[in-house]
Structure formats: C-alpha cells, structure tokens
Amino acid sequence: MIQQETRLKVADNSGAREILTIKVLGGSGRKFANIGDVIVASVKQATPGGAVKKGDVVKAVIVRTKTGARRPDGSYIKFDDNAAVIIRDDKTPRGTRIFGPVAREMREAGYMKIVSLAPEVL
C-alpha cells in the first residue's frame, strides 16, 4: 500500500530515480494506492540530462509493491521493492524502457504500453 509521503523507485528511463508521493488519485478521501493506481509525485532524485528534473511534479502509476496484490484465484504477488512508472495524461509512459518485472494487474488496468515494454510480466 502506497500512501502520502511514500518514496518509490522509478522503473523507467525518464530521468527520475526516486519519487515522493504527494497524492493518491481516485476519490476525495482516498488514502492508499495499490498496483495499477495513479499517484501525483515529486521527483526527489534524478539523473543528469533526463526528461524530468528534480523537483518536477509528475503523475506515476504503481507497478510493484512490497505489500503485493491478491489475485482472483486466491494467490498473492509480492515484490522486493515499491516502484512506479512516470506517465503522461494519456496513460503512456514518458520513458522508452521499463526496468524490472511488472504485475499482470497492469494489463487489466489498461496500461498496455507499459506491459509491452516490460521485460517480464508476473
């Protein structure tokens, strides 16, 4: 579960390395985000020459969480880190590569471009 002030790794090559959650989108009093949910975040660490700079406010979608997600068949999927991919308003990633695995729930949430760029879908 990702909440306000949570720091996440960035799993793409948009130029950001780490982001800090500002707000979870989707409802007035929503506190937590899971895999496939969109957040508003601030870039805390960035690589030189990247598309996004430190201090930029961006939208990102959660692709991996330590808490994990429960599948309809009763199984759970958990990851070693909390990670997100920076996206544009039309749900396409700002980077051209995705690093690390992403959850199958991304396909159901409608992020086909992220799923197709990912090296592994679990």
Swiss-Prot record:
GO annotation terms (biological process): translation
PROSITE patterns: RIBOSOMAL_L14
Function: Binds to 23S rRNA. Forms part of two intersubunit bridges in the 70S ribosome.
Keyword RNA-binding: yes
InterPro entries assigned to the protein according to its UniProt record, in alphabetical order: Ribosomal_uL14 (IPR000218), Ribosomal_uL14_bac-type (IPR005745), Ribosomal_uL14_CS (IPR019972), Ribosomal_uL14_sf (IPR036853)
Annotated Gene Ontology cellular component terms: cytosolic large ribosomal subunit
Subunit structure: Part of the 50S ribosomal subunit. Forms a cluster with proteins L3 and L19. In the 70S ribosome, L14 and L19 interact and together make contacts with the 16S rRNA in bridges B5 and B8.
Keywords (A to Z) from UniProt: Ribonucleoprotein, Ribosomal protein, RNA-binding, rRNA-binding
Family: Belongs to the universal ribosomal protein uL14 family.
Superkingdom, natural source: Bacteria
Molecular function GO terms recorded: large ribosomal subunit rRNA binding; structural constituent of ribosome
Pfam families: Ribosomal_L14
Protein name, as recorded: Large ribosomal subunit protein uL14
